[in-house]
């Protein structure tokens, strides 16, 4: 994976995660002092807009790293970061599907279920992906000696 791909994916993932968590917090844990208010916080709509508008860039970069990183790693066996990578992939697909369906759903019961799936998979993806990055960073510190041996052999 190229450096710009890693930075673009991490940046868009961070923006989508932060705006999603902040929007969820504003919508569900804040209460407006105005009994006639439609939103609980003045920035609630902005957080939702940033979340929804950043998500396509996040998905685009995911498609790029799918080709340059994920498919190649799926084909390799005994990768030390494999479990968190596969978990991230499954959670990303769940988060993506539920996020898309939230945009087009109309039934109140289905929307509640989709919100639960989207928030749950989004939170889980964020945690698992951060753990994937931490393990990758630790492996990267040990990798130069290992990669030089592989190049010689």
Question: What kind of feature is each model-predicted range?
Answer:
Residues 1-153:
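Membrane-embedded alpha-helical bundles that constitute the cytochrome b-like, heme-associated redox core
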């Amino acid at each position: 994976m190229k450096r710009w791909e890693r930075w673009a994916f991490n940046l868009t993932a961070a923006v989508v995660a932060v705006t999603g968590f902040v929007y969820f917090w504003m919508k569900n844990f804040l209460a407006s002092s105005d009994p006639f208010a439609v939103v609980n916080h003045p920035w609630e709509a902005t957080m939702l807009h940033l979340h929804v508008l950043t998500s396509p860039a996040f998905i685009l970069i995911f498609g790029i790293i799918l080709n340059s990183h994920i498919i190649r790693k799926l084909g390799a066996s005994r990768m030390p970061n494999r479990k968190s990578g596969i978990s991230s992939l499954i959670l990303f697909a769940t988060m993506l599907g539920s996020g898309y369906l939230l945009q087009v759903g109309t039934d109140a019961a289905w929307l509640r279920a989709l919100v639960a799936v989207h928030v749950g998979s989004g939170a889980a993806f964020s945690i698992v992906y951060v753990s994937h990055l931490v393990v990758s960073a630790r492996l990267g510190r040990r990798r130069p000696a290992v990669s030089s041996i592989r190049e010689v052999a």
